[in-house]
Amino acid sequence: MIVNVETLISMTEFHGLKESELSQKLKAIELAIRAYTNNNFQNRNVRFEAKTYSDKVYGSSPFLRVGDTIQISKSGVNDGIYTITEITPAFIRLDTRYLFAVDNNLITKVEYPVDIVQGVINLMKWEVENRDKVGIKSETLSRHSVTYFDQDANNTVMGYPLALLGFLQPYMKARF
């Protein structure tokens, strides 16, 4: 996961939100960023093949830690990104219960640069503070009037204001 849920919960903007809700939003943002940039942020120096079953990868690397994100590929059925929850000498436990038994999975560590992490925190703040105001252009109550930034197809990407996504520009990869 790009940002640890506990990190967000410690911030005042996210007090009162459920861990599961934050986790789900973070996973959605992570997948959206990977698709939008066409960049999987893999550290190909930390890569190995291993068997999978249930919630375990039967293999390891000395360069992986609890909380790291890995990508499983070339399995046919388990492809995706997962977070490590436990590491033992025999296996790595992931944040899922539904890995199919496959003998050859390519496991690669995923690392996000610091500016991506900060950008995701800013996106999450926007999500919490402004998502419910999307679609409302202005409000008036008696003599008090509030006008919001107009969001249309020209200035939004993936449901977020284009100005908030500038941090992704250096990581865009060409699509062929």
Regions from the PLM with identified roles:
Residues E129-K137:
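Short acidic, Pro/Gly- and aromatic-enriched capping/linker segments at domain boundaries
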Residues T147-F149:
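Non-catalytic terminal accessory segments
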Residues M1-Q118, R131, D152-F176:
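Conserved short "hinge" loops at termini or chain/domain junctions
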Residues M124:
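Short Cys/His-centered divalent metal-binding micro-motifs
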Residues I121:
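Glycine-rich and polybasic anion-binding loops at the starts of cofactor/ligand-binding domains
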